[in-house]
Amino acid sequence: MAFITEIANEAQWKTEVLETPGTLQVVEVFQSWCGPCKAVQSTFKKLYFDLNDRPLKFYSVSSERLSSLKEYVGKCKPIFLFFKDGKQVEKIEGVKAPQLNRIVTELSGKNPPPAAPAAAPAAPAAEAS
C-alpha cells in the first residue's frame, strides 16, 4: 500500500529509519516466505489517516534483507519495531492491533503544553476596623 514504504537495503534503512529525527517510524519486520501481515494493514491505514497531522511513517522490511535484523530471521509471527530519533523505543511481537494502535498513538503524539498551575485559594479579605 502507498502509505507503507518497503525498505529494500541497509542504506535505505539507515537513511529513512535511523537518521530521520523527530518522526516515529513503525517498522513491520516480516519473513520473505510469508510477506507483510495483511491483518494489520487496515490498522496501519486507519492510523495513517487518523494521525496524518503527526510526524509518523510506516515501513515494512524482510528480515532476510538487512544484517541488522538477522535476529528476526525464521520467526513465525510479524515483529513491529518502533523508532524515534534513530533509537528503538518499543517492540511488539505478533498481531496485536489494539496494542499497535495504542503505542502508535502515544509515541507519535505531540507533547501537550504544560498544565497551568492550580490557582491558590484567595486569601480572606482583611476586615476594616
From Swiss-Prot:
Disulfide bonds join C34-C37. Residues 107-129 are annotated as: Disordered. Pfam families: Thioredoxin. Gene3D superfamilies: Glutaredoxin (3.40.30.10). The keyword Transport applies. It comes from the Eukaryota. Keywords: Cell projection, Cilium, Cytoplasm, Cytoskeleton, Disulfide bond, Dynein, Electron transport, Flagellum, Microtubule, Motor protein, Redox-active center, Transport. It is found in: Cell projection, Cilium, Flagellum; Cytoplasm, Cytoskeleton, Flagellum axoneme. InterPro entries: Thioredoxin-like_sf (IPR036249), Thioredoxin_CS (IPR017937), Thioredoxin_domain (IPR013766), TXND_domain-containing (IPR051766). CDD domains: TRX_NDPK (cd02948). Residues 2-109 form the Thioredoxin domain. One of its GO terms (cellular component) is microtubule. May be involved in regulating the redox state of functionally important thiol groups within dynein. PANTHER family: NME/NM23 FAMILY MEMBER 8, NME_NM23 FAMILY MEMBER 8. This is Dynein 14 kDa light chain, flagellar outer arm. It comes from Chlamydomonas reinhardtii. The lineage of its organism: Eukaryota, Viridiplantae, Chlorophyta, core chlorophytes, Chlorophyceae.
